[in-house]
Regions:
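A short, structured beta-strand-centered segment in the mid-to-C-terminal lobe
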Residues: 9, 84-99
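Short amphipathic alpha-helical segments at helix-loop
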Residues: 2, 38, 82-89
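Phenylalanine-focused residue identity feature
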Residues: 16-17, 85, 97, 142
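Extracellular-facing binding/remodeling surfaces
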Residues: 23-27
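Amphipathic, well-ordered alpha-helical segments in soluble domains
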Residues: 13-20, 49, 100, 107
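Short, contiguous alpha-helical
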Residues: 28-82, 102-149
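Extreme N-terminal tail/first-helix region
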Residues: 1-16
Length: 149
């Protein structure tokens, strides 16, 4: 997939999720899906995930190959009452998601082929090595996957 195609897929997935999130009726926000997640929890989770991905993308571009990127335990974040996954209004998380995705899209559009091959080591629950190409594929689909697509 070319950089332009990646950017278009990323932008499309962003708009898909934003339309879906903004369209959830207030009385449906706390209905759990078969996996146990409510729309409210998914919206908050995606805002957190995108904030992490934005920082990771910036590090992939700016730091030397082999640098360590730090992950986070999304399951612990989901159950920390202070983070509000169960009760906080979703408007701020939707705004965070939109802003961070817009910032990431700006970066993606400026990438070149050599940027896509750069790798970083992950201090991340899923471990391994990452590169811009695989992280970009994950980010372009992630909103669709978590929103039931």
């Amino acid at each position: 997939m070319s950089i332009q195609e990646s950017a278009a897929a990323y932008e499309s997935a962003t708009q898909f999720f934003l339309n879906l999130a903004r369209g959830v009726a207030k009385d449906q926000l706390d209905v759990k899906d078969p996996e146990g997640w409510s729309a409210r929890q998914i919206i908050h989770h995606l805002a957190d995930s995108e904030a992490q991905s934005y920082a990771r993308l910036r590090r992939l571009v700016a730091e030397p190959e082999g640098s360590i990127i730090q992950g986070y335990d999304e399951n612990l974040w989901a159950v920390a009452p202070q983070l509000g996954y169960e009760s906080a209004p979703v408007e701020n998380s939707i705004a965070i998601f939109a802003a961070v995705r817009a910032g990431s899209l700006d970066i993606i559009k400026r990438l070149n082929e050599s940027d896509l091959e750069k790798t970083l080591s992950r201090a991340h629950p899923k471990g391994g090595r990452g590169d811009c190409r695989s992280d970009d594929r994950t980010r372009s689909r992630f909103g669709d996957n978590r929103s039931g697509d």
